[in-house]
């Protein structure tokens, strides 16, 4: 799901 991908992308740098 797009939301899951977005969450992952935002969490990667953190």
UniProtKB/Swiss-Prot annotation:
Protein's job: Mitochondrial membrane ATP synthase (F(1)F(0) ATP synthase or Complex V) produces ATP from ADP in the presence of a proton gradient across the membrane which is generated by electron transport complexes of the respiratory chain. F-type ATPases consist of two structural domains, F(1) - containing the extramembraneous catalytic core and F(0) - containing the membrane proton channel, linked together by a central stalk and a peripheral stalk. During catalysis, ATP synthesis in the catalytic domain of F(1) is coupled via a rotary mechanism of the central stalk subunits to proton translocation.
Family designation: Belongs to the ATPase A chain family.
GO annotation (BP), single: ATP biosynthetic process
Compartmental location: Mitochondrion inner membrane
Keywords: ATP synthesis, CF(0), Hydrogen ion transport, Ion transport, Membrane, Mitochondrion, Mitochondrion inner membrane, Transmembrane, Transport
Gene name, Swiss-Prot/TrEMBL: ATP6
Quaternary context: F-type ATPases have 2 components, CF(1) - the catalytic core - and CF(0) - the membrane proton channel. CF(1) has five subunits: alpha(3), beta(3), gamma(1), delta(1), epsilon(1). CF(0) has three main subunits: a, b and c.
Membrane topology: Multi-pass membrane protein
Lineage: Eukaryota, Viridiplantae, Streptophyta, Embryophyta, Tracheophyta
Name of the protein: ATP synthase subunit a
Organism superkingdom: Eukaryota
Assigned GO CC terms: mitochondrial inner membrane; proton-transporting ATP synthase complex
Main location: mitochondrion
């Amino acid at each position: 799901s797009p939301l899951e991908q977005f969450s992952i992308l935002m969490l990667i740098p953190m």
